[in-house]
C-alpha cells in the first residue's frame, strides 16, 4: 500500500483543532448568561493580548452592548473581537499572531491552552490518517 502524508502548517492545524475541540467545551455568554452553542461565539482580546475564553459573548449580545457602551462588559480596552472558534483560516491567523497568551482558569481556557502549547511548543508531529478512501465501509 502506498501512503501520502500531507503536512500542513501549525496555524492550519490550530484552526482545525479549534473547531474539533469546540463541541467538547461549554461556556456561557457573559451578557445574557445563556450557553454559547456549537456555532461558537465572540471572544474579545484586550490590549494586553491575553485571551480569556470564559469571557465570551453571543454575537448579538456583544453587538447590542457595543452600541450602548464604549467599553466591554468587563471594563477592558478591547483591541480585537474574534469569532471563536475562528470561522476562517485568515481570522485564525490574525488571532494567533495577535495573541500573547491565555488567561483564565475555567475548563475551556485550560483545554485550549493545552492544545495551543502542544502544537506550538512541543517537538512532536501529529499526522492525521483517513483510511475511508482506501477501505470500503461494511454495512
From Swiss-Prot:
Location relative to the cell: Host cytoplasm; Host nucleus
Disulfide bridges in this chain: none
Any one GO cellular component localisation term in the record: host cell cytoplasm
Source domain of life: Viruses
SUPFAM superfamilies, A to Z: RING/U-box (SSF57850)
Keyword Metal-binding found: no
Parts of the chain that traverse the membrane: none
Pfam families: Baculo_RING (PF05883)
Keywords associated with the record: Host cytoplasm, Host nucleus
Gene3D superfamilies, alphabetized: Zinc/RING finger domain, C3HC4 (zinc finger) (3.30.40.10)
Known role: Plays a role in nucleocapsid assembly.
Protein name: Protein AC53
Source organism (scientific name): Autographa californica nuclear polyhedrosis virus (AcMNPV)
